[in-house]
């Protein structure tokens, strides 16, 4: 707080000394951005992704992973406290490796003036797209799918405007779910699928949504939906647009822990 008023400084970590500039001043709080780290926090680390400073996809890569876990746990406890709830027992947080875990990503798409496609996450606090050439938090094979998207999109009919593409990794396949201005005509679909299979070099599902349609429609000829295992004995099927936990390992461990806490 500065003179009793809350100031949220983007990129700042607890227990460090910084210089900053205001970016937005409001009645009840201010927003600011770091201009210089004078005395870094012991938990400050070098971000593992070259896009981190511009991309809006991640916000805590500059904080040590274990401290990220502790920070998020404390945020949850603080939120419960503000709601008048106190945890009787706090279990150790479940954590997993910080890289290669995320099994879905929603990417913005824009066709540049030269006809090439920009594919990536929005810049933090902006509508501008940060073109992504790598994303180390994505699980394999999604990083390869990110790389192929600009090439594959160039095969689409020029009058189709693509707004967003979601990449999803199931245990049995990956899916590319496209939100666009219109559906491809029946005669356009085979060429789109051929080019997708050529670029993906592996099993891939193609889903599409246009206009006011709420659910995605599948364009390839496959019949099996995406699936993921939540226990050794239970596997769930899902479609693009339906909720799943982005971290498969954490999901399985959470389910296992909840089952272990049930009375026998």
Q: Residue ranges of each PLM-predicted region?
A:
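Accessory RNA-recognition modules of RNA-modification enzymes
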Residues: 1-264
């Amino acid at each position: 707080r500065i003179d009793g008023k809350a100031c949220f400084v983007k990129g700042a970590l607890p227990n460090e000394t910084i210089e900053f500039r205001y970016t937005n001043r409001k009645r009840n709080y201010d927003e600011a951005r770091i201009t210089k780290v004078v005395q870094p926090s012991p938990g400050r680390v070098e971000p593992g992704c070259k896009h981190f400073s511009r991309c809006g996809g991640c916000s805590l890569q500059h904080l040590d992973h274990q401290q990220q876990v502790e920070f998020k746990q404390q945020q949850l406890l603080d939120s419960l406290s503000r709601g008048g709830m106190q945890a009787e027992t706090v279990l150790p947080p479940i954590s997993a490796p910080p890289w290669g875990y995320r099994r879905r990503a929603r990417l913005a798409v824009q066709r540049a003036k030269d006809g090439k496609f920009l594919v990536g996450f929005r810049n933090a606090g902006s509508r501008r797209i940060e073109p992504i050439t790598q994303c180390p938090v994505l699980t394999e094979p999604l990083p390869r799918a990110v790389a192929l998207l600009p090439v594959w999109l160039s095969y689409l009919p020029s009058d189709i405007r693509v707004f967003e593409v979601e990449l999803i990794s199931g245990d049995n396949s990956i899916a590319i779910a496209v939100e666009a201005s219109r559906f491809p005509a029946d005669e356009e679909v085979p060429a789109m699928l051929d080019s997708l299979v050529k670029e993906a070099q592996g099993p891939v599902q193609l889903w599409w949504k246009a206009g006011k349609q709420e659910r995605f429609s599948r364009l390839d000829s496959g019949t099996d939906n995406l699936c993921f295992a939540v226990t050794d004995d239970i596997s769930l099927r899902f479609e693009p647009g339906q909720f799943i936990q982005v971290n498969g390992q954490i999901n399985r461990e959470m389910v296992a822990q909840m089952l272990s806490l049930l009375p026998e």
